[in-house]
């Protein structure tokens, strides 16, 4: 049994972290038996291999952190259940989209909305604290956590741009994904692959998060992306 540790579910999504959600998606797509547990954030640094979420604990006690490393571990242990049919060209396409999704779209579509925007941040806090009352001491810790995330946002470069420019980048990425998906059921064809675990997670987070910003609602203007989300939701009940 694989145990996945995350933050907390929200908005009908398995977890508020797109990377935790990606791991849950991969496990659901492959049919690997797993359970999800909410991590005690007070002991995260001690419990997680990298002090971050997600991480998994295997039945033999093995701990693995980082969503990409987790998926590679699962492939090595259980076999490559999703990608064995892909050609080298398709694997290259998957890698390129992986970079677009997790190193570009993640920042514009999620970090901008939840962490950079002040109103979005205030909307996000109740989900982070799981509905608990925010004490002054908790607020200090939350704001410090936000500052750390925004340091990464600025270091990536996206955070140094105006919301208008970030929204332009965001819409261009969504356009590219919609154009490539076209009328295919899944991003690389007729069945799900590992890249769909990441794409489905990120698009769900963008489409379903309550934070409002200049990119809000844009995913919903793409009928094929809306159909893609609904197709996976129905097929895998996630």
Swiss-Prot record:
A molecular function (GO) term: lyase activity
Any one annotated GO CC term: cytoplasm
The keyword Lyase is annotated on this UniProt entry: yes
Cysteines engaged in disulfide bonds, as pairs: none
Domain GST N-terminal: 7-82
pH behavior: Optimum pH is 8.5-9.0.
Residues covered by the GST C-terminal domain: 118-238
Reaction(s) this enzyme catalyzes, per UniProt: 2-glutathionyl-2-methylbut-3-en-1-ol = (3R)-3,4-epoxy-3-methylbut-1-ene + glutathione
Top-rank EC class of the record's enzyme: lyase
Matches recorded under PROSITE patterns: GST_CTER, GST_NTER
Activity control summary: Activity is inhibited by 1,2-epoxyhexane.
Keywords: Lyase, Plasmid
Name of one Pfam family that matches: GST_C_6
Entry EC number(s): 4.4.1.34
Summary of subunit composition and partner proteins: Homodimer.
Function summary: Involved in isoprene degradation. Catalyzes the glutathione-dependent ring opening of various epoxides. The highest conversion rate is observed with the physiological substrate, 3,4-epoxy-3-methyl-1-butene, which is the primary oxidation product of isoprene. It can also use other epoxides, including epoxyethane, epoxypropane, epithiopropane, epichlorohydrin, epifluorohydrin, epibromohydrin, 1,2-epoxybutane, 1,2-epoxyhexane, cis-2,3-epoxybutane, cis-1,2-dichloroepoxyethane and trans-1,2-dichloroepoxyethane.
Protein name: Isoprene-epoxide--glutathione S-transferase
Provenance organism: Rhodococcus sp. (strain AD45)
């Amino acid at each position: 049994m694989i145990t996945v540790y995350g933050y907390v579910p929200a908005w009908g999504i398995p977890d508020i972290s797109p990377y935790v959600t990606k791991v849950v998606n991969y496990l659901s797509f492959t049919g690997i038996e797993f359970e999800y547990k909410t991590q005690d954030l007070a002991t995260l640094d001690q419990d997680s291999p990298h002090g971050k979420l997600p991480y998994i604990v295997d039945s033999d006690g093995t701990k693995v952190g980082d969503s990409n490393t987790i998926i590679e571990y699962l492939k090595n242990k259980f076999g490559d259940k999703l990608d064995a049919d892909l050609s080298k060209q398709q694997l290259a396409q998957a890698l390129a989209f992986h970079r677009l999704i997790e190193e570009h779209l993640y920042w514009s579509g999620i970090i901008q909305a939840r962490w950079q925007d002040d109103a979005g941040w205030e909307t996000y806090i109740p989900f982070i604290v799981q509905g608990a009352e925010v004490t002054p001491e908790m607020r200090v810790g939350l704001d410090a956590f936000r500052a750390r995330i925004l340091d990464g946002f600025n270091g990536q470069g996206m955070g140094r741009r105006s919301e208008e420019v970030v929204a332009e980048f965001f819409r261009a990425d969504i356009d590219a994904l919609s154009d490539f998906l076209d009328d295919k059921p899944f991003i690389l064809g007729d069945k799900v692959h590992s890249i769909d675990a990441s794409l489905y997670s990120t698009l769900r987070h963008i489409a379903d998060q309550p934070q409002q910003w200049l990119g809000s609602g844009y995913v919903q203007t793409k009928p094929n992306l809306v159909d893609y989300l609904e197709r996976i939701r129905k097929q895998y009940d996630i």
